[in-house]
Structure formats: structure tokens, C-alpha cells
Amino acid sequence: MAEFRIDPEMELPVLPSRARADVSRKPEWLKINLRTDAEFVELKRLMRGQGLHTVCEEARCPNIFECWNRRTATFMILGDICTRNCGFCAVRSGVPTGLDLAEPERVADACVQLGLRHVVVTSVARDDLSDGGASIFAETIRAIRRKNPFTGVEVLIPDFGGNWDALAVVMDAEPDVLNHNIETVRRLSDRVRSRAKYDRSLELLRRAKEMKPHVSTKSSIMVGLGETMQELYEAMDDLRAAGVDIVTFGQYLRPTARHLAVEKFYTPAEFEHLREEALKRGFAHCESGPLVRSSYHADEQSAQAVARRTGAGRAAQTGD
């Protein structure tokens, strides 16, 4: 079959091709300039001083410099060894050891020291724990609230193996945003996500919204794994049916040769098309771009939720 290339100037929508694009080299729009200025080095030193892990580093996020300079960060709690082995993820897999009960307070202290405006708390999957780590998520949210009441808090959670009592523990702690990623379209889910289930993820998002309707819910999709545009439309429809408020789209980039191959690099025009389609479907917000990751510009996405939560307290402090 002839190779199919998309002119960035062509009119959308773009009909997908099953032919694999030339992915031997990254296109120009995926190239970034890495920076290690003094502020970045200081932030990294403070993270290490607290004995904390960030998914920004563990997952080799291309936006780490921008986000840290915006005073936003994504902490990875419950250790740095995952009990699952997803085909796209750079985080180490294996058998975790122990549970650090002091970690929530250290994360909260780091938020103060770093002056964070917004924090995302995520974790490795901990299928070895009866609640999947939900209680540590909840205590981390509460610890941040006690010490940083005006810092936005988003949690990016695993599926807890379908343990809805564990989900309720997290929701009762009242995060500003509850994020759980479906990662890919239904057809590819079993190949891409180790031990996760597409419909179980949708059920988690639906239940989270039912438990706390005022908490924004969010999910993310990687593109470039062999999905079609129609399948992406269907995934958006599935997320909206589950009551999801925010969706993000980003280009899948292969961490190592051992991970799933990139099937296609999407153009900036195609990402803009996905954003438009998401907004048409009623999502309150959509981030869509080649370098977008789940937590990209998370501070902007949750600003309204934080304002609702802290409005009364801020008014009391100022006497308004």
C-alpha cells in the first residue's frame, strides 16, 4: 500500500490510514530544547532532599522544564516500582517493598518549600495492597490541604483493581480534579495496558462523578499506537457518557526499543482537530498537542475548581 502523508495545510477532518507512516525520525514539531538552568537544578535538589519521586522524571516527560518553572509538579507516591508492566510506560516494574506512611507529609512539605501553585499526585500501580494505595492518596490530599490550602490538588489514580470502596476513600478527601487515564482506544487497550480494562476505567470515572459531582474528572489518550480517527471519536463519546469533564491528547513516544512501537506521528493540525471534536462533544476543557501529557497545564485546567473550593476561605482572610 502506498505511504499516506498528511499535508498540515489540508482541510480537516482527516480520514485515517491503516498504513504505517515513516516513523524512523521524529518530526520537527516534536523536538524540544532541554534546559538545566539554576532554578531547575534547585527544584531537583529540593525533591531529592525530601526523598520524593516525580513522574516528570520517571516517565521522561518532555515538559518537565516548563512545568517546574510554572511551579507545578507531579509527585509519584507509593514508591517507584510498579506491579504492572504496560507496553508504553518507562516506570520500572517489579515487586514493591513496604509502604512509607510518612510520605504524605513529605509531599505536603515539598509543596511549601517549592512554592507550588498546583500539584498532581499519581502513583505506580500497587496491586499488592488491599486498597491499591487509596488511603495514602487520601492522606496526601489532606496533608497538602492543611499546609497549602490554596494549592490546586489533582490526583491521577490507577484503577484499584475495580475496588470502588478504595475509590470512595480518595473521593472523600475531595481532590480538585480526579484523573484516571484510559490511555488508548478500546481495540488497543488490552495490548497497551497491563491488567487494566477499558470498561473498568470508564466505570471508575462514572462512579467518581456520581460520588462527588462537583469534582472535575479527567482522562487522557495517547495517539500514534495504531488507532483510527473514528476510534478516537468513539473513545471521546465513551468518556463523555461517563461524565468526564476534561480530556487530553498527546503523541505517544517510545521510551526504549523494548516498548511498543510508534505507528504514526500526528500533525499539529490533527491535534487541533481532536481538540475541536472534544469541545463539540461537550468537554469543558481539552489540551491537545504533540507534547501534551496528562498533567500538562493542569494548573489552568483546575483553576476554576480551586476558586470554587477556596473562595469562601479567601474572602474570610481578606475581610471581603
Curated annotation (Swiss-Prot):
A GO cellular component entry from the record: cytoplasm
Pathway: Protein modification; protein lipoylation via endogenous pathway; protein N(6)-(lipoyl)lysine from octanoyl-[acyl-carrier-protein]: step 2/2
Protein's cellular compartments: Cytoplasm
Keywords, ordered alphabetically: 4Fe-4S, Cytoplasm, Iron, Iron-sulfur, Metal-binding, S-adenosyl-L-methionine, Transferase
Positions annotated to bind [4Fe-4S] cluster 2: C82, C86, C89
Cofactor: [4Fe-4S] cluster
Pfam families to which the protein is assigned, alphabetical: LIAS_N (PF16881), Radical_SAM (PF04055)
Residues that, per the record, bind [4Fe-4S] cluster 1: C56, C61, C67, S295
Domain of life: Bacteria
Residue ranges occupied by any Radical SAM core domain in the UniProt entry: 68-284
Substrates-to-products reaction catalysed: [[Fe-S] cluster scaffold protein carrying a second [4Fe-4S](2+) cluster] + N(6)-octanoyl-L-lysyl-[protein] + 2 oxidized [2Fe-2S]-[ferredoxin] + 2 S-adenosyl-L-methionine + 4 H(+) = [[Fe-S] cluster scaffold protein] + N(6)-[(R)-dihydrolipoyl]-L-lysyl-[protein] + 4 Fe(3+) + 2 hydrogen sulfide + 2 5'-deoxyadenosine + 2 L-methionine + 2 reduced [2Fe-2S]-[ferredoxin]
Entry keyword Transport: no
GO molecular function ontology, one term from the record: 4 iron, 4 sulfur cluster binding
InterPro entries in UniProt: Aldolase_TIM (IPR013785), Elp3/MiaA/NifB-like_rSAM (IPR006638), LIAS_N (IPR031691), Lipoyl_synth (IPR003698), rSAM (IPR007197)
EC number: 2.8.1.8
Major localization listed first in the record, in broad terms: cytoplasm
Similarity comment text for this entry: Belongs to the radical SAM superfamily. Lipoyl synthase family.
Protein name listed in UniProt: Lipoyl synthase
Name of the gene encoding the protein in the UniProt record: lipA
